[in-house]
């Protein structure tokens, strides 16, 4: 039996759910500036596959890396950590 490689997982906030079966997740990453050493917040967006259209804007979600599903989609929804109020 072939074992799969480890998949990257990210936690972020849903910023768009206007597409069918797709959500846009904003992930905040704290990186150290190479010269000055200050911790800087960097935000990047991922398109993720949401098969049942269950996410809404403001939800905190966990996404996992997967095979390419379209031109921009390389992540899929694993779980909804917290629903939006």
Curated annotation (Swiss-Prot):
One of its GO terms (biological process) is translation. Keywords: Ribonucleoprotein, Ribosomal protein, RNA-binding, rRNA-binding. GO terms for cellular component: cytosolic small ribosomal subunit. It holds the Pfam family Ribosomal_S17. SUPFAM superfamilies: Nucleic acid-binding proteins. The keyword Protein biosynthesis does not apply. InterPro entries: NA-bd_OB-fold (IPR012340), Ribosomal_uS17 (IPR000266), Ribosomal_uS17_bact/chlr (IPR019984), Ribosomal_uS17_CS (IPR019979). GO terms for molecular function: rRNA binding; structural constituent of ribosome. It comes from the Bacteria. One of the primary rRNA binding proteins, it binds specifically to the 5'-end of 16S ribosomal RNA. Belongs to the universal ribosomal protein uS17 family. HAMAP family: Ribosomal_uS17_B (MF_01345_B). Part of the 30S ribosomal subunit. This is Small ribosomal subunit protein uS17. The gene is rpsQ.
């Amino acid at each position: 039996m072939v074992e799969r490689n480890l998949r990257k997982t990210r936690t972020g906030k849903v910023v768009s759910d206007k597409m069918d079966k797709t959500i846009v997740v904003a992930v905040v990453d704290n990186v150290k500036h190479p010269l000055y050493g200050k911790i800087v917040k960097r935000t990047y967006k991922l398109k993720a596959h949401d098969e049942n259209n269950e996410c809404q804007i403001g939800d905190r979600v966990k996404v996992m890396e997967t095979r390419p599903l379209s031109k921009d989609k390389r992540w899929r929804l694993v779980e909804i950590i917290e629903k939006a109020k």
